[in-house]
């Protein structure tokens, strides 16, 4: 139950952050609901469990910081409403919205640049892969044209296959024995 109360408190905290600047009155209500949830979690917590007490204490500390933040926002909000006329307030809100839109545009631009670099890197890797594939094919072609090297390469690949089959069988037998006797 305590964990559910703390989870609800965290949800209220995220809602508080979203509504702080757009609707400070709603943020105040969310803060009060969050305080009630934390007090209920605190009353149901086991005092011998130091971890849960520390968790609840940190939640209360964050609640106090958010209350201070809300008080600051409310003071600024009240000061703006007293000083600014409704038209000036609307202009200020439009200006803030424009700043936020510019910030979003900048982050989208940065993301697009990052994606372009990633695609360019991918193309470079594909090009390097094709170059290395061509080099490997040329070396194998040259090696196959020389009879002595061709025989050595064939024997090596046959030994590798044989060794890998033997190793695979050994590992599978050991795994089966381990499973049966464990």
From Swiss-Prot:
A Gene Ontology biological process term: vesicle fusion
Protein topology in the membrane: Single-pass type IV membrane protein
InterPro entries: Golgi_SNAP_su1
Residue spans, topological domain Cytoplasmic: 1-163
Protein location: Golgi apparatus membrane
Transmembrane segments: 164-181
GO molecular function, one term: SNAP receptor activity
Domain of life assignment: Eukaryota
Keyword Membrane: yes
All ranges on the Vesicular side of the membrane: 182
UniProt cross-references to Pfam families, sorted A to Z: V-SNARE_C (PF12352)
GO cellular component, one term: Golgi medial cisterna
Job of this protein: Nonessential SNARE involved in retrograde transport within the Golgi complex.
Quaternary structure annotation from Swiss-Prot or TrEMBL: Component of a SNARE complex consisting of sed5, gos1, ykt6, and sft1.
PANTHER family: GOLGI SNAP RECEPTOR COMPLEX MEMBER 1, GOS-28 SNARE- RELATED
Entry's family note: Belongs to the GOSR1 family.
Name under which the protein is recorded: Protein transport protein gos1
């Amino acid at each position: 139950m305590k964990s559910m109360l703390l989870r609800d408190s965290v949800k209220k905290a995220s809602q508080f952050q979203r509504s702080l600047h757009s609707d400070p009155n709603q943020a105040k209500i969310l803060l009060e609901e969050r305080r009630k949830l934390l007090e209920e979690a605190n009353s149901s917590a086991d005092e011998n469990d130091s971890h849960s007490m520390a968790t609840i204490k940190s939640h209360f500390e964050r609640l106090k910081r958010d209350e201070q933040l809300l008080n600051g926002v409310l003071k600024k909000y009240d000061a703006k409403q007293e000083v600014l006329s409704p038209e000036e307030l609307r202009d200020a809100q439009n200006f803030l919205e424009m700043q936020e839109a510019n910030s979003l545009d900048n982050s989208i631009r940065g993301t697009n640049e990052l994606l372009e670099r990633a695609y360019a890197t991918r193309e470079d890797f594909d090009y390097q892969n094709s170059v290395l594939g061509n080099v490997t094919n040329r070396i194998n072609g040259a090696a196959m044209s020389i009879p002595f090297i061709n025989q050595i390469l064939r024997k090596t690949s046959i030994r590798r296959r044989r060794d890998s089959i033997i190793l695979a069988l050994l590992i599978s037998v050991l795994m089966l024995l381990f499973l049966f006797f464990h």
